[in-house]
Amino acid sequence: MILRALVVVGLLTQAPAQMTRLPQFDNDRAVSWKSVIPAHTESTLLRHDRYRTIVAIVGGDLTLVGADGKKTVVHYETGKAYWQAPMPAGEMHKDANETGKTIELVVIEMK
């Protein structure tokens, strides 16, 4: 009985899941990272100044939340690659996973 109580308390006190960025490579031409975006998490405001390719390892619907609060849902299909241009000057957004599943993306950003 005590063991069960300790397990329950341990589960309740675990830190919430957070987005992680795992470096893949960095050279003169490009930098790459793997983004692991757990369910119901949100990044801080960010921007993309360079061209990039995004490969969906585990796809899903990622919500981009503009600094003005406007939401845009981007669907990433598992196994597909996507080309994205730099963001317009001054524009920023948050990445939000409002779904119940973790999304995993590899980003390759040109230098």
Range-by-range predicted roles:
Residues 1-8:
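Sec-dependent signal peptide recognition
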Residues 19-44, 49-55, 107-108:
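A short glycine-rich, His/Asp/Glu-containing loop-to-beta-strand
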Residues 35, 43-48, 65-66, 73-75, ...:
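Short histidine-centered beta-strand/loop micro-motifs
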Residues 40-44, 80-95:
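Histidine-centered metal-chelating micro-motifs
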